[in-house]
Amino acid sequence: MELIVKDAQSALTVSETTFGRDFNEALVHQVVVAYAAGARQGTRAQKTRAEVTGSGKKPWRQKGTGRARAGSVKSPIWRSGGVTFAAKPQDHSQKVNKKMYRGALKSILSELVRQDRLIIVEKFSVEAPKTKLLAQKLKDMALEDVLIITGELDENLFLAARNLYKVDVRDVAGIDPVSLIAFDKVVMTADAVKQVEEMLA
């Protein structure tokens, strides 16, 4: 299949299996959920009655005081006692097979093509690391919410994009399922397209 290269007014031949496959919603959902789960910190922690500081002595005798019976100052019922079902640090990461991950990326890229959200350009750069230059370039292309993917990370482009809301710059190694679906448009250089095809082959 062929994709139009916007700034060169030519066509780029790409793999049907990478940019023209059916959208597998269930697979994409599973991979996106797994990716988001892997980003969770999982460091929350509370103390059980066994872990809080306090005496193990019975506060008062069982009978005869008129007060409710109590066996420990560390009881979850008491102020400064332990937590009944205390949260502990957890690893939330999920295993995703390479084949599934690659399949999800291909599905997303193919859907971007179908929805006209993927824009191919011959090259994409700015002369200096100035936000103003990139903002004007994007305005000329009628782009606001955009992910820019280049073959190699252009430092000028990266620095120029840092202060722009809803604009991100990645190289091919930095793409992931969540970032691909998070932006309205994805701009990809011809060099990046070839690298993506090799990576997902």
UniProtKB/Swiss-Prot annotation:
Keywords per UniProt: Ribonucleoprotein, Ribosomal protein, RNA-binding, rRNA-binding
- Name the UniProt record assigns to this protein: Large ribosomal subunit protein uL4
NCBIfam families per UniProt = rplD_bact
- Which InterPro entries does UniProt cross-reference here? Ribosomal_uL4, Ribosomal_uL4-like, Ribosomal_uL4_dom_sf
What Gene3D superfamilies would the database entry show?
3.40.1370.10
Q: Name one GO molecular function term.
A: rRNA binding
Source taxon at top rank: Bacteria
Q: What does this protein do?
A: One of the primary rRNA binding proteins, this protein initially binds near the 5'-end of the 23S rRNA. It is important during the early stages of 50S assembly. It makes multiple contacts with different domains of the 23S rRNA in the assembled 50S subunit and ribosome.
Its BP terms in the Gene Ontology are: translation
- Cystine pairs annotated here are none
**Region annotation (Disordered) ranges:** 45-67
Q: Does the keyword Iron-sulfur apply?
A: no
Per the UniProt record, the source organism is Yersinia enterocolitica serotype O:8 / biotype 1B (strain NCTC 13174 / 8081)
Q: How does this polypeptide assemble, per the annotation?
A: Part of the 50S ribosomal subunit.
Q: Which Pfam families match?
A: Ribosomal_L4 (PF00573)
Similarity comment: Belongs to the universal ribosomal protein uL4 family.
Q: Does the keyword Transferase apply?
A: no
